[in-house]
Structure formats: C-alpha cells, structure tokens
Amino acid sequence: MSEKLKLHGFNNLTKSLSFNIYDICYAQSEKHRQEYIAYIDEQYNAERLTQILTDVVEIIGAHILNVSRQDYDPHGASVTMLIAEHEVPPPADSSEESPGPLPDAVVAHLDKSHVTVHTYPESHPDNGISTFRADIDVSTCGLISPLKALNYLIHSFDSDIVTIDYRVRGFTRDIDGAKLYIDHDINSIQNFLSEDTQEAYQMIDVNVYQENLFHTKMILKEFNLDNYLFGTGVSELNANEASNIRERLQKEMLEIFYSRNMPY
C-alpha cells in the first residue's frame, strides 16, 4: 500500500486514536498533595489543552470547525473540537439572522472527525501518591491520519505511562468497486513513534490484525526518584524513606501499566 490508492468517491474509513496518559508523583504531606492537584489543574487547564489540541489539528492537516471547553470544580478540564479534512467556508446565509443549528446537527458531525481531551487529577487518601490522567481521542474520517499526532501528544504531557489504542473502521472502495478496510500499512503503533520515544519507554503490543485493532502500552524505562517527588527532594529523605517511597511509586506505576493490583 505504499503507492497512493485510487478511490471511488470519498474515503469513508474512520481512524480512531485513543490515549490514556498518566503522570505519577509522591507528595509527602496533605499540603503538598493539594499543591500538586492545584499545579496540575493550572498546568493543564482548558486554555492550555485547547492550545495542545489546536497544534494536533494542525499537525494532522485538519481544520477546526468548532471548539467547546470547560474547567471543572474542584478540578479537571475538558476540550472538544469538531474538525474537517478540508476548510469549510461559511454558509451563504451565515450573515442572515436565523436560528442556529440544532444540537443533533453538531453531534452528528462529532461521530465523524473530532479531537477530545479530558483530565482526571487524583490522590491516594493516605499513602502520598498522586496521579494525573489525561484521556485523549483523535478520530478522523477521510485521508487524514491521527497517527501523525502520536509523538507530539506523548511529549506534550509528563507521560510516565501511556496506553494507546488505534483502530480503523468502515470501508472505502477502489475505482473497480472492491472494498478496502484499511488504506495504509501498519503492524504496530510503535512503527509511528520517534526513535527517542522508543528508546525512553518499555513497550508491549497486543494487536488484532484481522480486526484492524492495535494496542500499545508504554512505561518509562528510567526511574529517577527526584523526578517523582513534589514539594520535597531526595536529599531531604533518609535512606529508608527514599527506598520505601521508591518501592511504592514503582508498584503504583506497574499496577497502572498492567491494569491490575499487585500484592504488597
């Protein structure tokens, strides 16, 4: 499939890329935990997320039709963008006074091409570990590939653990009428990751090729305790404290990576 396919009519394939990105930290006191949540809330507020998604849309070569964003109380934010493969000119009657589109009309387009992000800061009630999760979905219809946004999104967040799902649905036809269920070569999401990303992460694939379903899990190879402490540093901890915190953080990260709780 290295050559460009000649299609009959519009490319009806829907390509969906989903991320779950986790940032883990240890905040020793309740005050530090609250400060971490506040920091994350500010660092990834709706305005910042809107800029990240705007960059994503530009990277994949799409055009923004509509933006909806919201910061939540006590914490968290979300942004949704409707996008199109080609720039959509305003309708001829856009300057006339008339009722706007019904919600159904907007949601109908959401089923085709959209970019969304939702954030979920949280903390353990008594062991000092706090996590931040960002869920990102990039769904496109047509020739646009969401895979182009892979590396940018991973590097836009403090990504300790990343879970990625990519699927292609629907079919399009070539000029002879034969159905095509995928229009590009892929055997792993890892093929689309930059070399520095591949070197930084340990990765596991679970792929169902016959269903055009690809799944990759990533966890940072290097563990530097100082990078995971919020409000304190390794120099302020004795050897036993540092060892205990390191063990708890690594256990937390492995549990999230494998999606299962582990015995103490």
UniProtKB/Swiss-Prot annotation:
Belongs to the prokaryotic AdoMetDC family. Type 2 subfamily. Is synthesized initially as an inactive proenzyme. Formation of the active enzyme involves a self-maturation process in which the active site pyruvoyl group is generated from an internal serine residue via an autocatalytic post-translational modification. Two non-identical subunits are generated from the proenzyme in this reaction, and the pyruvate is formed at the N-terminus of the alpha chain, which is derived from the carboxyl end of the proenzyme. Pfam families: AdoMet_dc. It catalyses: S-adenosyl-L-methionine + H(+) = S-adenosyl 3-(methylsulfanyl)propylamine + CO2. Heterooctamer of four alpha and four beta chains arranged as a tetramer of alpha/beta heterodimers. Its cofactor is pyruvate. This is S-adenosylmethionine decarboxylase proenzyme. It comes from the Bacteria. Binds 1 pyruvoyl group covalently per subunit. Coiled coil: none annotated. Keywords: Autocatalytic cleavage, Decarboxylase, Lyase, Polyamine biosynthesis, Pyruvate, S-adenosyl-L-methionine, Schiff base, Spermidine biosynthesis, Zymogen. The active site is at S113 (schiff-base intermediate with substrate), H118 (proton acceptor), C141 (proton donor). The keyword Zinc does not apply. Gene3D superfamilies: S-adenosylmethionine decarboxylase (3.60.90.10). One of its GO terms (molecular function) is adenosylmethionine decarboxylase activity. It comes from Hahella chejuensis (strain KCTC 2396). The modification Pyruvic acid (Ser) is found at S113.
